[in-house]
Amino acid sequence: MKNDLTNLETKLILSLNDIIKFKSNLSNTSFEHKVNHVMISPNGQNFIFMHRYFNSTGTRFDRLILSDCNGNLLKVLADNGMVSHCFWYNDNTILAYLRSTNGKDSYWLIDINSGNYTGFEPWCNKIRGDGHPSVLNNLVITDTYPDKSRMQSLYLSQKNSNLEYKLGEFFHGFDFNGETRCDLHPRFSLCGNYIFFDSVFSGKRTLYYINITKIKERINHG
């Protein structure tokens, strides 16, 4: 659906059937289909979304699809079984944790024009799994799921750099699981001086923030 906030009009630009048929041989009866994680490009011209479908045994398959904002489906950016979390790196590039054509699950930069994949340094070779990346200007943030010690971590990096900064670790107890689990889901303030995140390390779900102005100074001075 496309919502015009000026005229308060809503228009269907893509149906689920359109998405199912786009560059696939999938049946809309053999699988359960869902669409989620819709994200509009910074320039407002395109958007990406996940086409997620399940077979009769519950096995999940993911596709990452690119469309323009008029509902013209443009390209399947990923169709290798698993797509997790994505963010627009810039108007022409997606940063995503997904399975690439070589079968590797990692952080990848995808050129929406060529479809080429490039490993995102410094995270593409780290063995710590999925996270929730977010980008603002030249800064990139992501998190981790709880490790064996039940600690979740925040990592800050910079575009075109191999450096990363660990901002902290936060305990996630077993009392929070299933629907009550709490991912950190880090995101930048618009000014870029703060990172906000959710956590349960205090024993209840709370929104926290970290001031990163000093770390940004360190990054900018190499």
Identify the residue ranges that each predicted region occupies:
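Conserved beta-propeller blade repeats
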Residues: 20-47, 74-97, 124-143, 173-191, ...
